[in-house]
A protein has these predicted regions:
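A residue-level marker of the well-folded mature domains of exported/periplasmic proteins
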Residues: 1-191
Length: 191
């Protein structure tokens, strides 16, 4: 409402948690366009001046998956794991289209270079929870996962990987400084 009062006729929000507020404002100020990064309400609510958008991060996730698959192949070639042991763990925030799309792209990328790769997924039901994401990663590692990736926003999973010496593919943050021995690559949105 403050931005509309200042004369803005186009308003952007950049966090999943802002969607309901943006929708409410769109209904109140029908002559202003509201664009929300992520979300689904533009499709379900059908408010003409309310829009959802998201970056094509699935493309970066596919490439990150290729890097993960290459690492798995390296581990197989060095005798660190068997082809049957090429098990990826994935810490997902929610069972939600954005997360599932990124996870699927990542897995397809990994499988494109390491056909024996499998993947187990654990959801935290939170976008950002360091302790919960770390716990999920540790559980996946204890379940035999030899590489961890994530679609959650904290450094919890990378820190677990560094502690356990397990390669990590991060999301939306660089983990090189916090996991210098295990960080492989990260997909990051550059709006």
């Amino acid at each position: 409402a403050e931005l509309v009062d200042e004369g803005c006729d186009l308003v952007f929000a950049d966090s999943f948690g802002h969607e309901s507020y943006m929708l409410q404002a769109a209904k109140e100020f029908t002559d202003v366009q509201f664009c929300h990064a992520t979300g689904t309400m533009a499709h379900t609510e059908k408010v003409a001046n309310f829009h959802n958008a998201f970056a094509s991060i699935y493309e970066g996730r596919y490439l990150a998956g290729i890097a993960a698959g290459m690492k798995l192949n390296e581990m197989i070639e060095k005798g660190q794991i068997t082809a049957d042991g090429a098990k990826i763990g994935y810490v997902g925030a929610f069972d939600y289209a954005e997360v599932v799309s990124g996870m699927t792209s990542f897995y397809l990328g990994a499988r494109s270079v390491c056909e024996s790769a499998t993947m187990s997924v654990t959801y935290t039901n939170s976008w950002f929870d360091i302790a919960l994401e770390k716990e999920a990663a540790l559980s996946l590692i204890n379940d035999g996962c030899v590489l961890i990736s994530q679609h959650a926003d904290s450094e919890g999973a990378p820190k677990a990987c560094e502690e356990k010496g397990v390669p990590n593919v991060a999301y939306n943050i660089s983990t090189i400084s916090m996991a210098p021995n295990t960080a492989l690559i990260s997909s990051k949105i550059n709006w």
